[in-house]
Amino acid sequence: MGQRISSLPRRSLAFLRALKRNNRREWFQPRKEQFDADVREPLLAIVERLADDLRSIAPEIVVDPKTAMYRIYRDTRFSENKTPYKTHVAAVFPWRGLAKHEGAGLYFHVSPDEVWMGGGMYSPQTAQLQAVREHIAGNVRRMRAIVESPGFRRHVGELEGERLQRVPHGFPKDHAAAEYLKYRQFLAGRELPPAFACNPKFYSTLITVFRQVAPLARFLNEPLVNR
């Protein structure tokens, strides 16, 4: 496979579908080697190829194949759902100078239900969210230029994420950035059918989407990396 892999094999999706039906240790443990061969290794090949291509898109992104990929095991300590395994595989690419789940980054996952690729800021802490909102308020033209660009609209769509119903405290209700200031999450991406993970265009589409989302992630991270 090497670095030229362009999609996951059909057996990857077949295994994830079977895992969704049989999410039990006694089913998975005898098939751990099959999971590694059918799912983990092809995904790792995708991530290793991304390590080269993402450097030209956003040199600030950290692409470490060993840490980018999420483990298949679920942390069930504080969850009512005690199924031991995730039924999707995913990888995340954070920004240099920020922790893995701090700030904005790029991300994709493959599940039996969908493929999602994109990025943004998923769960900023209160102080981080305030810093990002202040940054948007002072740079609304730049923000608008990113999320309303033809390429962003064509390949990603619209900015998404949880939103407040009103402009947050501390900002004028009629602020030019009012609609952006309401966001509690800043997400941008593309959802595709699960079978698309096995399409020869999977990798090229992933690169195209990441190329459009990277400027948004860079903009959102500016007030965080410069603190």
Give each language-model segment a name.
Residues M1-P30, L187, P200, P223-R227:
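Short, charged, low-complexity amphipathic alpha-helix
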Residues R4-R10, A45, D52, F210-A214, ...:
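Polybasic/polar functional segments that serve as interface/processing modules
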Residues P59, V63-W95, A99, A145-R163:
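Soluble extramembrane domains of integral membrane proteins
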Residues R77, Q125, F171-T205:
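A solvent-exposed interaction/effector surface
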